């Protein structure tokens, strides 16, 4: 965890915005301080906690353990002036949404519960739509496998099911580890997730599926900022951070600005990381 925090702060020093979730897949969670509550309170960069559910990476926490974790997140975030979220890595084992919706029925505000990889299994996708209709956020991963045609098709299906457009997000899972399995479920290799897939799926939403540009762009901009309560992010307006992507008429990325500093010019990266050439 200290290494992760160090990387977040290194990215900030290099001119981009960065935050983190504490822990990994496991329960009990791994923390920087003595507990999840204190991580949220004492570490500005920590927005929440990550665990896995319904997946071979999961520790399969019980209903009561998930509730206790959510209460720690809620209390720590309230004191720190943050939203506080439980970021949940979903797998191919069905059932997690039953547990998550039970937490909501018991009184836990749904905005603290954030499942991701919602379209990698048909039954999990159905559960995600039910969760979205209950007021939760549905996050479609643009990298890796997708059980509904493409991530863009997943977003359109969630929209057509009646989930609020501002409660749908996409994330790349970029730079995450990507294991490769054979037909027996045996791991045969390990790769690294790419970061270009968000833009690819936004283009598909607009060009192939006819989703309005404002709606398509919002799933990787304003919706994300709203979902995580990131002040000054996600919307271009006076007083906000000058994070800007400029495209040509064919939706090719031409210029990029991060906090007002130009990072890409005419398709060429002009600002690189400390150890990049």
What are these model-derived regions, one by one?
Residues 11, 49, 89, 138, ...:
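Divalent metal-coordination and catalytic microenvironments
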Residues 65, 71-181, 186-189:
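Active-site core of metal-dependent hydrolases
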Residues 117, 140-142, 172-174, 217-220, ...:
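Active-site proximal loops enriched in glycine and acidic residues that flank catalytic Cys/His/Asp
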Residues 1-76, 90, 97-103:
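Active-site loop-helix segments enriched in His/Asp/Glu that coordinate
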Residues 2-6, 61-64, 68, 98, ...:
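Conserved active-site and cofactor/substrate-binding residues in soluble primary-metabolism enzymes
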Residues 161-246:
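His/Asp/Glu-enriched, well-ordered alpha-helical/loop segment
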Residues 235-277:
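C-terminal cap of metal-dependent C-N hydrolases
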